A protein has these predicted regions:
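Active-site "cap" helix and flanking loop/linker of ATP-utilizing ligase/carboxylase catalytic domains
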Residues: 29-50, 55-56, 65-113
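Short, flexible active-site loops
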Residues: 12-22, 63-76
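A short, structured beta-strand-centered segment in the mid-to-C-terminal lobe
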Residues: 23-27
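Peripheral (often C-terminal) accessory segments that flank ATP-dependent C-N-forming ligase machineries
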Residues: 89-167
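Short acidic-glycine loop/turn motifs at beta-strand connectors
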Residues: 54-58, 148-150
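A general structural signal for well-ordered alpha-helical segments in protein cores
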Residues: 32, 61, 84, 138-141
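Single conserved hydrophobic/aromatic residue that forms the stacking wall/gate
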Residues: 1-7, 11
Length: 167
């Protein structure tokens, strides 16, 4: 199996708001061990997303999603091969692509509405993904992915996008 970098997630009103891909997470190896055992037991093909909570220095599984997952959308621009492409490769029996990170990456969800598109796309290192869904309070209607050369730049870009989201 291949594993993507762990991501640290921030939730607002129980909905994923921000996901930051970690370069080196101290619990990455433990997470890969847990996930690997599940994949082997199920003889699983495709993308399987796990959400863990850090508890007392260990991990507790909260969600297992047998599909591409919102928390992995950062891979679209932030990995050599995105979760979407690797899912298609897996189910088609093709060789999997590298999940290696490209730079420092994050994803911010647009909930209920999409900020001014011109302002979002004017932010350096920012990529807009609009789902074309009807706007509804709390509904995921799009997201921005960020890919930067370093963590300081990433944090600055996150603040810029978040300011647009907050209005």
């Amino acid at each position: 199996p291949l594993y993507s970098s762990a991501a640290s997630d921030v939730y607002k009103r129980q909905v994923l708001a921000l996901s930051i891909a970690s370069t080196e997470h101290p619990l990455q190896a433990l997470a890969e061990d847990y996930v690997g055992r599940v994949l082997t037991k199920l003889d699983y093909v495709g993308v399987l997303a796990f959400e863990f909570f850090e508890v007392d220095g260990g991990l507790k599984a909260n969600e297992i999603a047998p599909r591409v997952h919102n928390s992995g959308h950062w891979t679209i621009e932030g990995a050599e091969c995105s979760q979407f492409e690797n899912h298609l490769r897996a189910v088609a029996g093709l060789p999997l692509g590298s999940t290696a990170k490209v730079g420092e990456s994050a994803m911010l969800n647009f909930l209920g509405s999409v900020p001014d598109v011109a302002k979002v796309t004017a932010i350096a290192d920012c990529h807009l993904h609009h789902y074309g869904k009807a706007f509804k309070a709390g509904r995921k209607v799009g997201h921005a992915t960020l890919r930067c050369a370093d963590m300081a730049s990433l944090k600055a870009r996150i603040a810029e996008v978040d300011a647009l989201i907050q209005g």
